[in-house]
Amino acid sequence: MAPRRLLRGLRRSMGGAGLALCVGLASPVAAEVITGARFEGPTTRYGHAILGDGIEFTELVIETEDWANKVRYRVTLPADHVFEDLEPRLWDITDDGAPEVVVIETDMARGGSLAVYDQTGKIAETPHIGRTNRWLAPVGAADLDGDGRIEVAFVDRPHLAKVLRVFEWDGTALVLDMELGGLTNHRIGEDFITGGLRVCGGMPELITADADWSDVMVTRVVGGALQTASLGPFSPAAVEAALACR
């Protein structure tokens, strides 16, 4: 449950739209590995305020390292997009042993999407929800069904539709794989997302609430389909216990 805050720091960007090399030179000897990411460029140009304030972000700074160098890249969004998010997530989506950067990227006319970046720019994105002021809340990423490919899960419109959607990385894109209704992980105005991914006994599972916030729910893939069950009455302590496999 990450607190919402303005992340400040690097200001030595080359400027301009898209991806900019900010600091250092990449080494030709060893591959760069992403070690950190943060949002910059706070903006009030999108008034959704789903996370409790009217401040979103226009820039994503990605930090990488190789054997000799530390490099920073800056992604600057076009004027009709914002990062409607808390913090960037370092999740391995491509299953190469190194993380990518996963963010909520919102088109101000078409709503939220889940976008994946690396140091080359955006490498994948789920479809935008379809209209303004519509958002999604990430849950986690893992090989949920044991097929050797990574799936990434989020709740589509956690205040309205309350549908858990699972997209699979197919080697070039994120493709819708499974979905299940009746689950949520965010309430309007909260500056955190409830639940997440846990691995208990070697099995990745998704922790959320049910649609009316009465129960903590655990969802796993069984026989190629999502299966959900209650872990008991909802409370913040119960969510923490569930994530810790207690």
Task: Go through each PLM region and give its residues.
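N-terminal secretory signal peptides that target proteins for export/translocation
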Residues: 1-10
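Bacterial N-terminal signal peptides
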Residues: 13-26
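Beta-propeller-forming repeat regions
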Residues: 4, 28-246
